Design a protein with these regions (language model features):
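P-loop (Walker A) phosphate-binding loop of NTP-binding proteins
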Residues: 8, 33, 62
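Conserved RecA-like ASCE P-loop NTPase motor core of nucleic-acid helicases/translocases
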Residues: 55-71
């Protein structure tokens, strides 16, 4: 590696090693364009560290496929390494172990070094939790291409990290390894697939001039600058935006593109797909699990998982993507775009829907736009690490009574199934989804007396937790702590709760629960 083309990579390797050998709480943020040797730098650093001592190295990323090059480069240099499984490489008593972000935060395993690859694709709240629990950390991310940084990582997280960890280091790798310097083929590839789509700075004077226009997709092909700006917004906002999305965007007759404009400037984009309108025969086949027609995610889920067969005949416009220029995020433009979309969809559309990887921020955004949760997927998405949430919205001129009924059933199902189906759900997500009180439920007076007794040191947790769960759901989980949700709804073990919240054991956990319950009982008098 004496060649000059490896100078930056060699420096990156030394910075990674310094995270282990230097002071604690001085994380490294490593960024690079595609083909700059970022993943190989991680692998080389792991190998060189393991050659000197048996370290416990944990590697997390949105999916294990994203970190395969790290293992390959480490194994190339470690001749005595044993690949135990796809996710584990052992060298003597040391190892490199992959762990999914959600599992990392639920089990909090000890390690000597934690590498967080493609960090931009991991929700910012999870990155903050990782920072608080682990003190020898490397965050790495691509900043161009479809794995590229969203502004949430580059702005929100890195700014927060600089405040929390003043000794942090950042290093950006620019030197090409996969390509020659100024390689014409790389330039062509980036242009062809809009891999380097950049956004120009934007500002607006107010909402009055914001409009939403459905665009002719063929016109996009003939206006490359318009297409580039539209796609730049999508790449910036969504980690999973890929070349296939570009083709889908241009070819699919059922999908539509809406551009939010302020005067002549593009400030946002919405992609929708029309679904539903299924016939009786197909609906029955979907209900029985015999058919799953492509392009009908919302009606298939509602028919097969929720049992509402008649909804399959209705037409929905599902929002696949919504992106707002990062300079303008948080100013209400996204909500305004969704309001304008309701006015723009065809008269034949019966309701709106959306499905996305659930985070607190996104749930709050869609709830504020009037969308209601009706189904939470049972498996985390491999790329985002999030559960998929299906939400629907009534149109002003088309009442859909089934939506309120379905949301009530969703709340009932979720609160009863959290510990069985979603034991690793983040407590904050449970709070976001079960925030609304159940007005028609009241607690039997005897149950309340028991809760009062427990709050003051009597009864036992095992004798009251069912009534506690009922009472908390009655009032909604808005004011309920993460600890209370973890124990009462997710049924986490006492030891896990203690470890997660920095307490010594069951006794301290119960003290916290009793104290919080006493405050909540005085806050809610029924």
């Amino acid at each position: 590696q004496r060649n000059t083309e490896y100078i930056e990579q060699t420096h990156a390797v030394s910075l990674i090693e310094k995270v282990v050998n230097g002071h604690r709480k001085r994380p490294l943020v490593l960024t690079a364009d595609r083909g700059r040797g970022k993943s190989s730098a991680l692998g080389i650093a792991c190998a060189q560290l393991l050659q000197h001592k048996p370290l416990r190295i944990l590697l997390t990323a949105p999916s294990i496929n994203a970190v395969e090059p790290v293992y390959q480069h480490a194994q190339r240099l470690l001749t005595d390494a044993k690949q135990m499984k796809k996710d584990r490489l052992e060298v003597g008593y040391g190892y490199i172990q992959f762990i999914a972000p959600d599992e990392l935060l639920s089990s909090l395993p000890e390690c000597d070094l934690l590498l967080v690859d493609e960090a931009a694709a991991i929700p910012v709240p999870m990155l903050k939790q990782i920072t608080e629990h682990y003190h020898r950390l490397v965050f790495s991310s691509t900043i161009h291409g479809y794995e590229g940084c969203g502004r949430g990582f580059t702005l929100k997280f890195i700014e927060w990290l600089q405040q929390q960890r003043p000794g942090m280091k950042t290093y950006h790798m620019q030197q090409p390894i996969r390509w020659s310097v100024d390689d014409k083929l790389e330039t062509w590839l980036y242009d062809a697939f809009i891999l380097n789509a950049e956004l120009s700075p934007q500002s607006i004077e107010g909402m009055a001039n914001v409009s939403l226009n459905k665009v002719d997709k063929q016109a996009l092909v003939h206006q490359p600058n318009l297409l580039r700006e539209c796609f730049a917004l999508l790449v910036n906002a969504h980690y999973q935006t890929s070349p296939n999305d570009l083709l889908h965007l241009l070819r699919d007759d059922n999908s539509s593109v809406y551009l939010a404009m302020d005067k002549q400037n593009i400030i946002g984009v919405i992609l929708t797909v029309e679904e539903g309108g299924l016939d009786d025969e197909l609906i029955e086949a979907v209900q029985l699990g015999q058919r799953r027609p492509k392009g009908h995610l919302t009606p298939i889920t509602i028919i097969n998982q929720l049992g509402l067969v008649k909804v399959g005949k209705l037409i929905t416009s599902r929002v696949m993507r919504i992106a707002v220029h990062p300079d303008l995020q948080g100013s209400g433009i996204g909500k305004r775009m969704l309001t304008l979309l309701e006015e723009s969809v065809g008269a034949h559309v019966d309701y709106l829907s959306t499905s996305f990887g659930a985070t607190d921020e996104l749930i709050q955004f869609w709830q504020q736009a009037g969308y209601q949760s009706i189904r939470l997927g049972t498996m985390r998405d491999a790329a985002s690490g999030c559960y998929s949430l299906l939400m629907v919205r009534q149109l002003a001129n088309k009442s859909q009574t089934w939506i309120d009924d379905t949301q009530a059933l969703f709340h009932e199902f979720l609160s009863a199934s959290l510990s069985l189906v979603y034991p690793k759900l983040e407590p904050s997500l449970a709070r976001s989804l079960l925030r609304q009180p159940i007005q028609h439920q009241t607690l039997h007076p005897t149950k309340r007396v028991l809760l009062q007794s427990y709050a003051q040191g009597g009864a036992s947790y095992e004798s009251i937790f069912v009534w506690l769960q009922q009472w908390l759901r009655q009032h909604g989980l808005g004011p309920v702590s993460d600890l209370m949700i973890s124990k009462v709804f997710l049924n986490h073990d006492w030891g896990i709760c203690a470890k997660q919240f920095g307490l010594s054991g069951r006794k301290q956990v119960e003290q916290q629960l009793r104290s919080e319950l006493e405050k909540l009982l005085s806050q809610f008098t029924v």
